[in-house]
């Protein structure tokens, strides 16, 4: 039996969504920069084995929009919820819950789909601080699961993938391969530009 499904990764800017996706896929498919909102596209990372396929949809970092483009990007991120079976809501272990997190939580409650809370950057905090973070977020919403990880180091990422695959429904293989190499190269070039230039780069 082959299992498949779509999974969205939501979270505030720079919480490690792209780092997680890149670790899972083993290649750089989402640009990483210290500028917020640098992941423009619903970049799909496709995790495929002989028995399952997870199609990851990475969203623009959700923020309080200050421009029409920013507003479009936020709504684009939320529109993803209509296309997936499960949401990974990613938050950083080393930052307290903020207004941006609360805004996302309210949207997720309204969406009424399974949400897994992924607490990233656990390598940066003491276990006691991690437990406080888990309790705080659990007090706000009933999550299907809570999974602490370090996307950068890969800690507990395999367990998260297993959790996702265990909950997939029977289905077919949506995609035979990942994004075209041309797309990957163009995104890597744009990342270099963002890192090297001190001027305003459209992003």
UniProtKB/Swiss-Prot annotation:
Record region (G2): 37-41
Localization per record: Cytoplasm; Cell membrane
InterPro entries: G_ERA_dom (IPR030388), GTP-bd (IPR006073), GTPase_Era-like (IPR005662), KH_dom-like_a/b (IPR015946), P-loop_NTPase (IPR027417), Small_GTP-bd (IPR005225)
Sequence segments annotated as region (G4): 120-123
CC terms in the record's Gene Ontology section: cytosol; plasma membrane
A single GO BP: ribosomal small subunit assembly
Membrane topology term: Peripheral membrane protein
Stretches for region G1: 11-18
MF annotations from Gene Ontology: GTP binding; ribosomal small subunit binding; rRNA binding
Era-type G domain mapped to chain residues: 3-170
Chief place of localization: cytoplasm
Pfam families: MMR_HSR1
Region: G5, residue numbers: 149-151
PROSITE patterns: G_ERA
Domain of life: Bacteria
Residues that hold GTP according to the record: 11-18, 58-62, 120-123
Region (G3): 58-61
UniProt keyword terms in alphabetical order: Cell membrane, Cytoplasm, GTP-binding, Membrane, Nucleotide-binding, Ribosome biogenesis
Summary of subunit composition and partner proteins: Monomer.
Reported function: An essential GTPase that binds both GDP and GTP, with rapid nucleotide exchange. Plays a role in 16S rRNA processing and 30S ribosomal subunit biogenesis and possibly also in cell cycle regulation and energy metabolism.
Family listed: Belongs to the TRAFAC class TrmE-Era-EngA-EngB-Septin-like GTPase superfamily. Era GTPase family.
Protein name according to UniProt: GTPase Era
Source organism: Streptococcus pyogenes serotype M49
């Amino acid at each position: 039996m082959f299992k498949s499904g779509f999974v969205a990764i939501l979270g505030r800017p720079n919480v490690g969504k792209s780092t997680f996706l890149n670790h899972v896929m083993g290649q750089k498919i989402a640009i990483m920069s210290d500028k917020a909102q640098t992941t423009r596209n619903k970049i799909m990372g496709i995790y495929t084995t002989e028995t399952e396929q997870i199609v990851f949809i990475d969203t623009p970092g959700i923020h309080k929009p200050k421009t029409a483009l920013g507003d479009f990007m936020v709504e684009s991120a939320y529109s993803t919820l209509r296309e997936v079976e499960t949401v990974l809501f990613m938050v950083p272990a080393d930052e307290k819950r903020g207004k941006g997190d609360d805004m996302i939580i309210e949207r997720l409650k309204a969406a009424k789909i399974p949400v897994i809370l992924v607490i990233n950057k656990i390598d940066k905090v003491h276990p006691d601080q991690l437990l406080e973070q888990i309790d705080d977020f659990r007090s706000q919403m009933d999550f299907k699961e809570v999974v602490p990880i370090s996307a950068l180091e890969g800690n507990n990422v395999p367990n998260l993938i297993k959790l996702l695959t265990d909950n997939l429904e029977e289905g077919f293989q949506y995609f035979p391969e990942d994004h075209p190499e041309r797309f990957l190269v163009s995104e890597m070039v744009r990342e270099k530009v963002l890192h090297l230039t001190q001027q305003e780069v459209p992003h």
